[in-house]
């Protein structure tokens, strides 16, 4: 084993990756590399080197991340209904709720392109009844937005990163990605919505503003994490 591999393995096993300068982390480590983990809650592709990511680590440890949210949802989700998962992250909750009752369809929304690709793979490998939306849920539909990409080299919890809109309209930038917004009220739902979860790190109010008609019509329970 050469000195390069010795140094690399040291930083991985000791979980000291975050101490390296960002440029070195990006160059030396393939931090976007995914690994398939077979767990008691399903099979999930997760970032292999995101060693400080709480959601990732809970899933790998055969746990349900935010188990109380899942347990609360199960009480309200009914057969033959739709569940809205706004801010689906890696998709564990979407996968589990799609299977908790008969004929449940989950509508999962995720804004980050990188996280969305992981979400899509996890839905597919678990054969879950989930409809995917790569959109920023808010109070407008089809509004073209530019947001800052997640700095995945920091190895923190992806779900704790706030969506940051930017006036820099350059999708070729290494730090910017383009995305279309969507409002819940503009989506056609062919059957009853029995539950809605919102976890979008500071964008919750915009989601609710764009869901007013749906909420008044459906009267579904909603659970969300509000941040000022």
List the predicted regions and their residue ranges.
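Phosphate/nucleotide-binding beta-alpha loop and adjacent structural elements of enzyme active sites
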Residues: 1-228
């Amino acid at each position: 084993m050469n000195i390069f591999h010795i140094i690399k393995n040291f930083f991985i096993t000791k979980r000291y990756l975050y101490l390296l300068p960002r440029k070195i982390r990006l160059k030396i480590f393939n931090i976007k590399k995914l690994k398939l983990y077979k767990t008691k809650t399903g099979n999930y592709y997760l970032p292999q080197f995101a060693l400080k990511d709480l959601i990732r680590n809970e899933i790998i440890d055969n746990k349900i991340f935010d188990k109380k949210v899942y347990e609360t949802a199960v009480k309200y989700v009914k057969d033959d209904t739709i569940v809205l998962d706004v801010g689906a992250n890696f998709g564990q909750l979407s996968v589990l709720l799609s299977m908790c009752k008969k004929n449940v369809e989950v509508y999962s929304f995720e804004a980050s392109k990188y996280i969305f690709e992981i979400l899509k793979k996890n839905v597919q490998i678990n054969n879950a009844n989930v409809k995917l939306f790569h959109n920023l849920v808010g109070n407008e539909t089809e509004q073209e937005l530019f947001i800052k990409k997640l700095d995945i080299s920091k190895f923190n919890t992806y779900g704790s990163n706030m969506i940051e809109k930017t006036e820099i309209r350059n999708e070729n930038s290494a730090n910017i990605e383009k995305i279309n917004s969507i409002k819940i009220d503009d989506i056609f739902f062919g059957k009853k919505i029995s539950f809605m979860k919102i976890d979008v790190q500071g964008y919750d109010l915009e989601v609710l503003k764009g869901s007013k008609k749906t909420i008044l019509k459906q009267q579904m329970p909603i659970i969300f994490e509000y941040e000022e």
